[in-house]
C-alpha cells in the first residue's frame, strides 16, 4: 500500500507540473506584449517559444501566402484565445504574426487581411 501511495504521489507531481493548453494560450498572450515591429523571426520565436503541449504546436502552423504586392509573406499562427468548448482549434483562436524578409511587420487578422487581401480563413459562425 505504501508503494501505491508513492506512485500516486509521483504521478501527481509529474502531471501537476505539466503545462496545459490554457497555460500556453496565456503565455502566448503575455509574450505578445514583448514583441515589436522589426524584430527578426528568430527573435520572435525566442520570445513566443516553439514547444508542443498536449499535441498543440507552438507556433500552431506556418504559411507563406502571396501578398497584394506579389511578395511572399511568412505567417506564424499562435494559439492565443479560446472561443468554444472542445479540442478543435479554429482560426478565430489564433493570432497571425506576419513577416516579410525575415522581419516582423505586423500581427493580427486585420493586418494580415491588409497585406494578403485574398487570404482565406475560417471563422466559425454561431
Residue ranges and their predicted role:
Residues 1-17:
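Sec-dependent bacterial lipoprotein signal peptides
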